[in-house]
Amino acid sequence: MMEFILSHVEKGVMTLTLNRPERLNSFNDEMHAQLAECLKQVERDDTIRCLLLTGAGRGFCAGQDLNDRNVDPTGPAPDLGMSVERFYHPLIRRLAKLPKPVICAVNGVAAGAGATLALGCDIVIAARSAKFVMAFSKLGLVPDCGGTWLLPRVAGRARAMGLALLGNQLSAEQAHEWGMIWQVVDDETLADTAQQLARHLATQPTFGLGLIKQAINSAETNTLDTQLDLERDYQRLAGRSADYREGVSAFLAKRSPQFTGK
């Protein structure tokens, strides 16, 4: 069986590489299944404290492999909603709920579901040559993989509407200028920059980082009062963590903290 997802764990970081470079790492059913299995390991293994997602070859991900669907323009219409519900929705939900930082290193093109997958990660670093393409409208489709929820939040309504309706390429530099991604780096430094950041996050108070992630995600739909209540509850949990005690002890002793992620 082909390895469509390459998995490597080192220094608390799991690096998952989308590995169908001949198809620009576009998704097929088996690739989805392999990625789901890898995410199970991230969820269950407390020694993995950061997830890094990237692509092999000259692109990050071109979205869904249309050849894999065997669509016959003259035949019965496929149920694309079922495909989205079966594969993409669980993926996006799992990444959003994962109580660990998720970094995406975007090399080359990120198109369709590949673009929304990348932008849905917690921190996005892109190579200078990277391009984001909301290609759905070119096929008469609706942005999926969380795209219609995500785009207005990372780009604002006007830009989200333009990106979705026009389906034009968006450069990494422009995405950074619009605040959609964290950082743009030279192509040759992308892998090292992303790994360095992932390894740093893997040494930090993972439990607290997970609470931060969930709080910020919840703020998108919460009222101020609801969010204040959530901050209170999460701060209570964080204050009971071993990492909080270690952080305070290290501060008072003027030494570097040794967080365990708990």
PLM regions: where:
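Conserved CoA-thioester-binding segment of acyl-CoA-metabolizing enzymes
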Residues: M1-A56, R93
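Terminal low-complexity tails and localization/encapsulation signals of metabolic enzymes
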Residues: M2-E3, S249-K262
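Crotonase-fold acyl-CoA enzyme core
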Residues: R93-L209, R232, R236-S241, E246-S249, ...
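Short, charged, surface-exposed hinge/linker loops at domain edges
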Residues: K213-N222
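Glycine- (often His-adjacent) and acidic-residue-rich active-site loop
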Residues: G55-R94, A110, T223
